[in-house]
Amino acid sequence: MKQTLIAGVLGALIWARVGDDAGAATRTIPRPLPSHPGNIFLVGETVTVPTLPAGDGDTWRAVDYEGRTVAQGRVASGPVELGRLPVGYYEIRRAAAGATNRLSVGVLEGLHAPTPLSSPICIDVAMAWFYPKEKMGSVASLCALAGINRVRDRLSWPELEPRKAEFAATNRYDWSAQAQSAAGLQVLQVDHLSPAWANPDGKRFPLDLRDSYNFFRDMARRWQGEVVAFEPWNEADIPMFGGHTGSEMASLQKVAYLGLKAGNPKVIACLNVFALHNAATLHDLHENEAWPYFDTFNLHHYEAFNAYPRLYADFRAVSAGKPLWVTECSVPVKWHGDERLQEPTDEDLLVQSERLAITYAQAIHEGAQAVYYFILPHFVEGQTQFGVLRPDLTPRPAFVALAAAGRLLADAKPLGQVKDGNKSIHAILFRASPDGQRADVLVAWSETETALDLPKPPKACFDHLGRARKVTGKVLKLNRAPLFAVLERGTRLPLVPPPEPAKLELGKPSSIVMQAVMPEASTVLEKSAYKATAGQTTTIPIFLYNFGAKPARGRLSTPMSFNSTKPLVSPPWEAELPSVVEVAPGERKELALRLTGVSTNGVEAAAIRITGEFGVAGRAVLSLNLVPIVN
């Protein structure tokens, strides 16, 4: 309970800082744009589409999520009026089948209160990359209507700083920040490339981390009041984005944090986010004591729902008690048929919308304070379709499900998982603010058709699309599609409490940062380690940076530990590094870490922990993993 309280206070401090910096305290209830981009309407509005989809025949019909006809008429030129429709997903069809003969429409319940600043319902939009300037306002409006609190964008360092210290004029990254912040959305930005002048291998971190410091300082200044949070790198732990070790990720994190805070002390400096659930990389980052240098611990996952408890437990263990942000997650579906459309089957569209609600519910239950579903725009990788919108901004059913989660799980905090003898039932209770009213909200589904008894009838019940559902008495009829049951606050249910947050680790950032620079070819990525050749002296370049305003003098120590298959009488390897060092303000000082006596005789791996005590400048830590190899 104590750790839960501390985590809640940390989260509240972050939200308060966001509101103060971005003017989010003035967030209002959004209204649709007059043009109704994406054919998204609110209940009570007359649904009108500008034109019918292409197709044969002289009639059309509109059907709901279940395929039931709700309107029909004869083909004519000009706008087509469907009348006032209840919450739901609809398609206008010109023929019995064929995605090219369909046009989708979404009807949402309008928000009854502004979306809370602490609501966990967020989404990855990547607006700067996916939408031209003229569509950005429309996309931001759709996010706001869906009750989204925070959005994730993308930036390109090479575009923003094509030459060192020469920044681009106003461009798509500024436009996207302006459009989203103007809609009341809290913007998170992320980078994943170095410009060629900082590293010829663009997928790797800059060689000189002062370049990262300067870039993030200037971006935090440039977008103050518009971009409230930054991830310094995307998925640095996989080869696509550089294949970095946990140690390298920690060094970048420390420098980026210092730069961001120098540019805007109120900005949220997120951890450069993990792609993989790899224990070695997680441990490596943690050993480098990076926790004073991130405000939130960020991760991604695309694993099956039954893997969530173990996955979150492992990340939570190295989170240092910081708020968990999941900035990409989903259990996606495949597309089939016409490769120009890349559209899932009708059945998979239903599955996508059902999984979206479950993704939010389970991630929040595991302790995530911000959950960014991946992804709003139409986006495919291979045969996988991730997007909840189509290229023309019209919705897939999952967008309507997104709006239901945004409204009904607004400000959701987990209370626990319902204990029930039926193992097919999944039911998670939250304290939330559905429609602006504090209540307990139960999200429940089942792998088989069954029923769940409640202590008393719910105040209201909605399906995963946000459509009102009648409940007879105290019984919820469940199937694979989640239900949202709104209960009175304090409703007593038999609960398994949510996982406790990790213990909050204490520490202060140091202005001194250390970095090892090794070629990518020397990395053993699955072990988050570098290769050390047996029988040879291995030299590792170590760089010390001073981001303070005064010279720093400190003492370095290099204790080693070994993972061995047999007892070691004496340390088989030796590490040599100058014991005393001075670093001027702004300096990047190179030292040589020399390893001698490297052998494979019983040693499977070694760790070197360089600790620098720099007095008022603070304590610097660099931990490196090594594996011996034989040429």
Segments (PLM) and residue ranges:
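Short acidic, flexible loop segments centered on an aromatic residue
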Residues: 61-63, 454-458, 549-570
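Carbohydrate-binding surface patches
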Residues: 36, 64-65, 419-457, 552
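Aromatic/acidic polysaccharide-binding cleft in carbohydrate-active enzymes
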Residues: 340-403, 417-423
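Short, surface-exposed loop/turn segments at beta-strand-coil junctions that are enriched for proline
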Residues: 82-85, 596-602
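C-terminal beta-strand-rich structural cap/linker in extracellular carbohydrate-active enzymes
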Residues: 472-515
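Terminal connector regions
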Residues: 98-101, 495-513, 598-631
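N-terminal substrate-binding region of glycoside hydrolase catalytic domains
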Residues: 79, 108-214, 218, 231
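Active-site cleft segment of glycoside hydrolase catalytic domains centered on the general acid/base Glu
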Residues: 163-164, 171, 198-294, 301-317, ...
